[in-house]
Amino acid sequence: IAGKTEAEKYLVQSILAKNGSYLVIDPEGILEGQTSEKLKQEGYHVYICNVDDTKGFFYDYFRYYYYNIFHNEKTVLYLTGSDKIRNEKLIAEITLILDDILNGKMDLSQHLTLMVNDFGHLAGGINFPHKLSRIKGTQVSAILCTESLLPLQTEHYNPMLTDEILDSCNVITEK
């Protein structure tokens, strides 16, 4: 996929395909704006969390408000908030949430797709991509759309992205 517009179209189509539930990390709220109403009309439980409005430890906030929502079929949670969501501390907390999902601590009665839309600071030393290597054999899949995950290009090389991780994810890169 050549650019941001094409990547976002792909992500919108993937969400509207309605395959299970979705956790969508969407800093600018672009995917939420294009899909949430359509999903509501299709009977989805739609939750929108603007992380800029949360206080304290986001992991605790998530556990209190959203931890058990994915046991319902047809659920989508959008995490938006362009300022705070790109913070390394918050990325680390989202990594803990992903850990809980992959370790079976959250009740997933159906397939969950994790989508990351343009998460520009993802690669900065956080082990979030490493967690995705454990995705095979779970009810979770991932679609990543971010320039920081450009696979193995010299000026953009990210040593945390092994072939195993890239093979387990559908990676869309901007050029």
List where the protein language model places each region:
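P-loop NTPase motor domains
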Residues: 1-144, 149-157, 161-170
